[in-house]
Amino acid sequence: MLAFYYYYAQYWKRKAAYALLQYGRNAQNHEERKWAAQQALMAGHKDAAKLYALTCPEAFDKELPLVPFYRDNIKCVFADYYYSKRFHNFIDEDQWQFANTVYLFKEGKDECSQYFAQTFKALRPACDITIMFMPCSTQKHYYNRFSSLAYFFLKFRGVQSGIDYISFTGERESKHTSQQRNKIEESSNYIINTNLTGKKIIIVDDLLTTGKSLSSYAKKLKDSGAEIAGAIFLAKTFLLPTNAKVKWIVWKHFFLS
């Protein structure tokens, strides 16, 4: 009889956990999503940790939107988090819209000037700045992606553009679509065609993930005489924490509240 009641209780616990997870995934209010994810996790649903982490990314990342931080001694700022497509069933409407904006920017369909203006302001750069853009897989992609943004900074911010300071020597595989992105040599298809001695450079790119591209490009700019004043990004890829870390945060919050 005790075994029957135990399995009966476990059955309804699983049903409750599933219902809470679905409620959280569909909730529009942030606090409701957070509460439902927390309750589903404590009820034992295997996907609840993912929902909670994606609902509260700032709880699991030391590098926050529009707050300067450093990578390889380079002062960096990004506008918001980007979430991989495999997480799109667990993010809210605003997060999905921003992720879609990143895709549009990559395709040259949205200059995202309002987001880059926010990152530029948060970086608090000195005067006499030149912006240079992260080289792409092809010259066509490079100019489609960055030419409108370069014009925006020149017209509305008075910032000199270095968009033509690099020349493309060929094409390389796109890191965005490659299955072996870590093996791609970013500097294999371009050269810096201008002496940058004395220029203070802010690097502009769409997405910060590992920081490998940033470090590689910054080195080439320094080798050409530039001083790196900072880097701004449209987004930073949110890396999902382990389930154990999420559970620790949730249960700690529960017992301390």
Give a label for each model feature.
Residues L2-Y5, Y23, A40-A43:
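Alpha-helical solenoid scaffolds that mediate protein-protein interactions
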Residues Y6-Y7, L20, A27:
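Residue at a conserved register position within TPR or TPR-like alpha-solenoid repeats
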Residues R14, Y18-L21, K34, K50:
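TPR/TPR-like alpha-solenoid signature
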Residues K34-D47, A53:
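TPR/TPR-like (Sel1-like) alpha-helical repeat modules
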Residues K50-D128, S167-N195, T237:
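Active-site-facing substrate-recognition patch
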Residues D128-S137:
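Short glycine-rich phosphate-binding loop at a beta-alpha junction
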Residues C136-N144:
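Glycine-rich phosphate-binding loops at beta-strand->alpha-helix junctions
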Residues D164-S257:
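PRPP/pyrophosphate-binding module of the type I phosphoribosyltransferase fold
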